[in-house]
């Protein structure tokens, strides 16, 4: 059965309903942003109300709002593409506070050390809800309560893409992030997510063909960006610079080295934390077609960010659900899920090497 779509404005005021459409595909991500694409036949009731900045959501899932960014109209159909609501963060970079001095060097680094949730909220406040330049503020966005979850690590950013900083915090600490609409209060909320471990106990979630909730799976073991030994540089210059290493036991072909620059850090313990954050294990992942049947169903028994047990090809792995692509077409829903970190992409490698430092 095809679900209708509700349409609202950025102010969360309802604009109308789209009772039917040809197809809807959207990707939810725990650490990254995700995307969506909607196809509607011209003449469908409500089609002419579709426009950029429109929020779309399924009536039974009002917390999963999609933000329209591109509209293409041809003779037969309208194609709408965009991002989940958290994609608002793609419109901002990390701008550090200005400092007095040379007008051509008026910005330093935005450094923060603390638990993962505090790090998320620090960079969200500095660039979304309470920036130094009021013109950068996202209207109607508020921060969730800080519960101080996640590992304590040092972070620094200087004109980095905000979504990349959030993705780094997430992949390093296991906590996710999102922006969700609070329809009752009429505001948008930046929230930090902590997935549930569903690998043991009465709430255990197991996915396998035998249980009828998975139809095929593929396994990937990716060592492209693996780093097991990190040299880190702190304060000082040239031969006087503070240098230390972590993970310095591997040797031979098993040794994969990396560099982390944490300028201005003179505390050895903080420098070691920065080096440890640069460690990057092999990225193993499982991609599976999920079924809306059998025991243990997506959206009912487990959700994005949860750690579940996946069994396929006589292999078993406990892994976090990091991305789900949902497709609504021809009256049915299909699901494609990624557990664990996906394979390293060229864009990811370039990003990592360009940033070079702990950021």
Residue positions per predicted region:
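Intrinsically disordered, low-complexity terminal/linker regions enriched in Pro/Ser/Gly
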Residues: 101-135, 257-262, 272, 278-280, ...
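Oligomerization/assembly interface segments of phage tail-like spikes and tubes
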Residues: 28-43, 76-90, 169, 232, ...
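Extended Gly/Ser/Thr-rich low-complexity repeat segments
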Residues: 47-61, 90-102, 200-211, 302-306, ...
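Extracytoplasmic/secreted envelope proteins and their assembly/folding machinery
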Residues: 163-166, 229-230, 272
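Beta-strand-rich assembly/attachment modules of structural machines
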Residues: 1-114
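Charged- and aromatic-enriched interaction segments used to assemble
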Residues: 85-222
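Acidic, low-complexity/disordered segments
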Residues: 80, 96, 227, 235-268, ...
